Amino acid sequence: MGAGPVGLIFSLLLAKQNKNSHLLELRKKNDAGSDNRALALSYGTKLVLENLGIWALLEKKITPIQSIHTSQKNSFGRTLLSAEEYNLPALGYVVSYGDLSKALKEEINQSSLVKISYEFEVSAIENKEDKSILYGRTKNSPLETPLLILADGGKNNTDLIQNLKRKETSYNHTALVTKVISEILPNNVAYERFTSMGPIALLPNGPKEFSLVWTGKDIDIQALAKTKKNVFLEKLHEHFGDRVGRFLDCEKFITFPLRKTVLEDFPKSHIVVIGNSAQTMHPVAGQGFNTGIRDAYALSKLMNESELAHIGSESFVSTYYLSRQSETKKTLFFTDSLVNIFSNDLVGLSITRGFSLSLLDNFRPIKNFLVNKMSFGK
């Protein structure tokens, strides 16, 4: 369930194994194509997309990140990570949600092994000893499967699954997302700036624009979103500083609350939860989407290594979750640590942050850890 990028990539991974899949999507057919939200793709995600033949379809729509500049407002200390330093073609890549979805669907349209049903509203899910049964409000219902994959972002169907429990914790933060144009061109550099109003991330998105993600306390970001464009651009410059010059223009703001979600319990057979349906995290480290792709890859790999009759069994489901447990916990801990350290404006902590950024810039093992975490989730 779910025909977003994670669900689409999972189906293409199965098609590579000559396995059939049926994607069920609540939205209309072309809804995702106009979605301009920026996705930060890790190098590991690029390798998955290359393997599926998607990268060639996307290459002209993707902006590589060659270096990442991290600093703190009104404080010493900064860190610079460079792809060249680690013999990587890029530290990451930026693409719009809509462009990625279009490329994935273009590839799926060439496959007879993947079917997509749009505007499919699920009314009930029943788990039997040997299968999962899904009921919809359409004539194509019910549907039976040995393995039901929930990859709908956790928005629509989690309440329908018995024994599926998720723990949700609010960060009491809101994210503001838009595109901005600055005096100095991006030149494939991404910036992370820690400020008293929360972290500001600028991701190069094309030759002339940055995608901006500004996260902070709910009350601060909600007030910011109500300001006029010229006032907002001045505020952004005030907090970000002069590194890209003044900000000249921006698009319409999108805001959304930030929450951490983790699985506490799940059905023991015939249902697996992946992507944002399984876990959501703060965007400060850019790990959420890429963790979902690693979920999809790990599950498809396990299916490829398993006997057909074993897929969906209790031992199969248990093996999958155990294979993802360690990395997911480490990624959530890593992300939460960044939030706690860099979203707190206490004076003592601010000094510690400045020292940490200086230390990081001169201590290769920590930089190696960061690059591996960003690139491969390790």
Q: Residues of each region from the PLM?
A:
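Glycine-rich Rossmann-fold phosphate-binding loop(s) that bind the pyrophosphate
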Residues: G2-P5
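Glycine-rich FAD pyrophosphate-binding loop
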Residues: L12-R37
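N-terminal glycine-rich dinucleotide-binding loop that anchors FAD/FMN and/or NAD(P) in oxidoreductases
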Residues: R37-K60
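Conserved N-terminal helical subregion
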Residues: L47-N51, I62-I161, T169-T174
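Conserved FAD-binding catalytic core of PHBH/FMO-like flavoproteins
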Residues: L49, N140-P142, L147-G245, F253
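Pyridoxal 5′-phosphate
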Residues: N127, P186, G292
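FAD/FMN-dependent oxidoreductases across multiple families
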Residues: D220-S315
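C-terminal helical "tail/cap" subdomain of flavin- and related membrane-associated enzymes
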Residues: K301-K378
